[in-house]
């Protein structure tokens, strides 16, 4: 999977905590942040109005589905 670079502004406290976690887990900060973002996006679900894709009113879909619909 191709990866893109994203720049974040984090508090000094968040960086300290992230560094401790990095040392404990023996993985990079990028790996921890990538995992956290992926988990967050998985948990996010939004009600969607009836769309051309045959969804029913109020059906819940994930972020990926909404991104695809937005581009169409």
From Swiss-Prot:
Gene3D superfamilies, per database record: Met repressor-like
GO MF: sequence-specific DNA binding
Span list, region Disordered: 51-72
GO biological process assignments: regulation of DNA-templated transcription
CDD domains attached to this UniProt entry: RHH_CopG_NikR-like
Pfam families: RHH_1 (PF01402)
Family affiliation: Belongs to the YiiE family.
Protein name as annotated: Uncharacterized protein YiiE
UniProt organism field: Escherichia coli (strain K12)
């Amino acid at each position: 999977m191709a990866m893109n670079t994203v720049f974040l502004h984090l508090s000094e406290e968040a960086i300290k905590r992230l560094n401790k976690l990095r040392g404990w887990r023996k993985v990079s900060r990028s790996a921890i942040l990538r995992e956290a973002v992926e988990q967050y996006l998985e948990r996010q679900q939004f009600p969607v109005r009836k769309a051309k894709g045959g969804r029913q009113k109020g059906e819940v879909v994930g972020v990926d589905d909404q991104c695809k619909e937005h581009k169409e």
